[in-house]
């Protein structure tokens, strides 16, 4: 019998949510619960979903002035009540994102902009559902403190920690970075000491975390749901590169390089286009990317069922990580949630990232994508020209990617292995 699992997440949405649901694909819905402060579109996937709200989340000024927090509720069906950031496209929010936010990050006030506490309402709900395991990826200092508080109240519930990235090192610059890292390190060490299960998403992370913290970590790749696509795929007459996902400090410079690459090719007479599918607000796009030329087209995010058709129809897919010191620290152990899905399409993938991180090492060793390890649009231009030429080497690369998706990233294989691990006797 499957144990009851409560997933506690900062934001259960987009690729992170899909990856987690794919990991729990073998789990019966009546044994799966979730508590999250953002995102309820996947609420129907759970027996019950607790939307963390103003009972558990307290923002400090000026964040309390800029962020509306809904009431804490048990969500049913897929009701879309969330912390309302994206809807507030006001002057004060624009000033905050473009002027105040960088200062707060620099002074290390961003990570602690809110605190979380275990409310009586949430404690009563946890008592009611009586989970055997709490599964969390932590992700920041407030969530780390929150997980520890929940454990102190419910010490009998086993903790499963899944480390997807090295969140102890933020992607933005901090004046006193060592102080921030030490604080986060102490919290993560405490969580790892009480955890019954310790997981990572890359072998590099499992190996180096064992050396760093002294615990054994089990690696589970980010699984992808493979589907037989019998429909004919129609490529657009205009060669295009597609990126689907978040835009932030970890990848904005790489995306800007691709934007410049496409615009340079356009100016040289090549008819090419860069299609970006993201849920970023206009303010966020301006903040992270600046002014964008017409050769780059932004699209609203599409349902997950449709994204595979978009990826299949592309001439090339783009997997970006900014080649900077701070992005390298944050992503050194990460594996993109999109990688398996990209590879499964058989469409050539252009990857950009620092040479020392897990994704770069994986892609180069498996020879499943074109790896660009230097910043600058000229390097992406060379990669894109190789894709357009589509020689036998590119075809072989794509075939290796498909095989990896069917074996290493296959949801049926990974999720069964994951279920066996969580259900075994400790």
Tell what function each PLM region has:
Residues 5, 133, 137, 149-170:
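Active-site proximal beta-strand in glycosyltransferases
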Residues 33-112:
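Conserved N-terminal ligand/cofactor-binding loop architecture of enzyme catalytic domains
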Residues 124, 142-145, 149, 153, ...:
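Membrane-proximal helix-turn-helix segments that form the acceptor-binding/catalytic region
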Residues 204, 222-223:
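Carbohydrate-associated surface elements
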Residues 225-228, 234-290, 297-305:
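Conserved catalytic-core segment of nucleotide-activated headgroup transferases in glycan assembly
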Residues 250-253, 305-307, 317-340, 349-361:
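Nucleotide-sugar-dependent
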Residues 374-375, 379, 392-422:
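A charged, aromatic-enriched C-terminal amphipathic alpha-helix characteristic of glycosyltransferases
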């Amino acid at each position: 019998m499957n144990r009851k699992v409560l997933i506690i997440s900062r934001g259960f949405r987009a690729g992170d949510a899909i990856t987690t649901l794919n990991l729990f694909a073998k789990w019966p819905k009546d044994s799966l619960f979730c508590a999250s402060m953002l995102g309820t579109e996947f609420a129907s996937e759970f027996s019950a979903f607790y939307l963390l709200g103003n009972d558990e989340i307290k923002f400090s000024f000026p964040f309390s002035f800029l962020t509306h927090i809904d009431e804490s509720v048990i969500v049913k069906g897929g009701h879309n009540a969330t912390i309302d950031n994206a809807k507030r496209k006001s002057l004060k929010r624009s000033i905050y994102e473009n002027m105040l936010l960088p200062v707060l990050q620099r002074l290390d006030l961003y990570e602690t902009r809110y605190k979380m506490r275990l409310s009586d309402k949430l404690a009563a709900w946890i008592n009611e559902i009586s989970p055997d395991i709490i599964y969390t990826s932590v992700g920041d200092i407030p969530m780390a403190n929150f997980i520890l508080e929940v454990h102190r109240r419910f010490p009998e519930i086993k903790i499963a920690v899944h480390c997807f990235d090295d969140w102890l090192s933020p992607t933005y610059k901090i004046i006193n970075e060592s102080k921030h890292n030490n604080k986060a390190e102490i919290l993560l060490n405490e969580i790892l000491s009480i955890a019954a299960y310790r997981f990572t998403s890359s072998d590099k992370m499992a190996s180096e975390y064992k050396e760093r913290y002294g615990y054994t970590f089990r690696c589970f790749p980010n699984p992808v749901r493979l589907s037989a696509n019998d429909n004919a795929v129609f490529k657009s007459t205009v060669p295009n590169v597609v990126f689907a996902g978040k835009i932030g400090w970890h990848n904005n410079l790489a995306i800007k390089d691709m934007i410049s690459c496409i615009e340079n090719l356009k100016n040289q007479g090549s008819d090419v286009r860069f299609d970006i599918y993201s849920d970023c607000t206009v303010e966020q796009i301006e903040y992270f990317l600046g002014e964008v030329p017409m050769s780059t087209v932004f699209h609203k995010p599409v349902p997950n069922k449709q994204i595979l058709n978009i990826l299949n129809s592309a001439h090339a897919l783009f997997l970006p990580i900014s080649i900077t010191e701070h992005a390298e620290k944050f992503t050194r152990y990460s594996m993109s949630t999109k990688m398996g899905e990209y590879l499964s399409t058989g469409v050539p993938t252009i990857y950009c990232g620092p040479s020392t991180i897990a994704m770069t090492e994986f892609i180069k060793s498996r020879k499943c994508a074109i790896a660009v390890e230097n910043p600058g649009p000229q390097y992406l231009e060379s990669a894109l020209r190789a894709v357009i030429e589509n020689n036998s080497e590119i075809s072989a690369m794509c075939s290796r990617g498909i095989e990896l998706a069917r074996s290493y990233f296959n949801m049926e294989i990974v999720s069964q292995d994951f279920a066996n691990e969580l259900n075994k006797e400790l």
